[in-house]
Swiss-Prot record:
It is a multi-pass membrane protein. Its main location: membrane. This is Defect at low temperature protein 1. Belongs to the DLT1 family. Keywords: Membrane, Transmembrane, Transmembrane helix. The lineage of its organism: Eukaryota, Fungi, Dikarya, Ascomycota, Saccharomycotina. Residues 236-255 are annotated as: Disordered. The keyword Disulfide bond does not apply. Residues 246-255 have a biased composition (Polar residues). Residues 37-47 are extracellular. It is found in: Membrane. GO terms for cellular component: membrane. The chain crosses the membrane at residues 16-36, 48-68.
């Protein structure tokens, strides 16, 4: 800023101060003079009119000046574009302010280039990534919904596939069911407690489920299922006296495969229906879980598992994978896929280290 600009600014400010002082002085003198003139007059009506009129004129003039200033300022601001930045000396005479604005603009440009595409994969809690995942999770898998489905099947349908008989009330919680199953099958109470603690932390913490928590819960769920299988909780059940039902075992024997069960009949009738979820109907179920209505049968055979991490098996994929296997090969494949070869009372941590 040169000398002429500084002189002009000082003249502008000085003249503004002088005019304001004159305006305030005359505004104060006018009412006082009006009252002094009225006091010398003998006409009371005229005196009252002069005094009241002076105060009213002063108030109206002050309001007009204030409102006019506001309207003029707003009209000037409306003419400025919304995306305009005051970076010129005419708009912002203060040099440090202009320099700060220009520096921040340069910094924003550099950050935009750096942050346009993140270098590391972005993973949000509660949802799987939309692209391929190194852990084999489906794209955009909702962790909370998957855990709800898994725990509901464990509670209402046995261990994922009606493998264990549950004598529980509808109002029992998942923790109660898990403790009851671990006690009935003589599993480690500490393992069951850790499994329940992890479930409650995931479901009731109020925070989004992380990928690590979801994978840990799936590992412990599989370990819990395999522990129940290893303890013999799904060994052949003898029929109860007088119930008129046949013995079943898991996996089914050749004699049981020759029997016609309601589930087998359902699969036969709808063998060409690709929408039928056969995850729960590959093997005949125990008579303890005999279905008493067609609606229950339809629910078990059409329950959607596409939102879980379990593979959805359709009739065509089942025939493609297992049609060429004989009974012995099928049983060996089942044992190889469903058992971790647990030792008696082996803990979850020891299995992880061994694998």
């Amino acid at each position: 800023m040169n000398g002429d600009e500084k002189l002009g600014i000082w003249l502008y400010r000085t003249s503004l101060v002088v005019l304001v002082l004159f305006f305030v002085g005359f505004s104060v003198v006018v009412p006082i003079d009006a009252m002094a003139q009225a006091s010398r007059s003998t006409n009371d009506a005229l005196n009252t009119f002069i005094v009241v009129g002076a105060f009213v004129a002063f108030g109206v003039l002050s309001i007009i000046i204030a409102v006019g200033r506001v309207l003029v300022q707003r009209s000037c601001l409306q003419d400025i574009p919304k995306g305009y930045l005051p970076i010129t000396p005419e708009d912002m005479p203060h040099q440090p302010s202009r320099s700060m604005i220009l520096e921040q603009m340069d910094r924003s440009h550099k950050l935009a280039v750096l942050l346009k595409k993140p270098k590391e994969p972005v993973t949000h809690d509660g949802l799987a990534r939309p692209d391929s995942d190194d852990h084999g999770l489906p794209p955009l898998l909702n962790y909370e919904d998957s855990i709800k489905i898994i725990t509901s099947r464990l509670k209402y349908q046995g261990v994922f596939s009606n493998l264990v008989k549950l004598d529980s009330d509808t109002g029992d919680t998942f923790a109660t069911i898990a403790r009851s199953m671990s006690a009935q099958n003589k599993l480690s109470s500490s393992e069951a407690a850790e499994y329940i603690k992890l479930y409650e932390a995931i479901r009731f913490s109020g925070k989004e489920i992380t990928k690590e928590q979801f994978l840990q819960f799936m590992d412990r769920s599989i370990f819990f299922l395999d522990s129940l299988i290893s303890t013999g909780s799904i060994e052949p059940r003898s029929h109860r006296a007088g119930d008129g039902q046949k013995n079943y075992s898991f996996p089914p024997t050749r004699a049981q495969n020759t029997l016609t069960t309601p589930l087998q009949q359902y699969v036969t009738d709808y063998a060409d229906n690709e929408s039928v979820d056969t995850t729960n109907i590959i093997f005949p179920r125990s008579p303890d879980y005999a279905l008493e209505s067609s609606s229950a049968l339809h629910y078990l055979t059409t329950t959607n598992t596409s939102s879980t991490v379990a593979r959805k098996v359709t009739p065509s994929s089942y025939r493609k994978d297992f049609s060429g296997l004989n009974e012995t090969a099928s049983e060996e494949a089942f044992r190889g896929n469903n058992h971790l070869k647990l030792n008696d009372n082996e803990s979850y941590d020891s299995v992880v280290k061994r694998c």
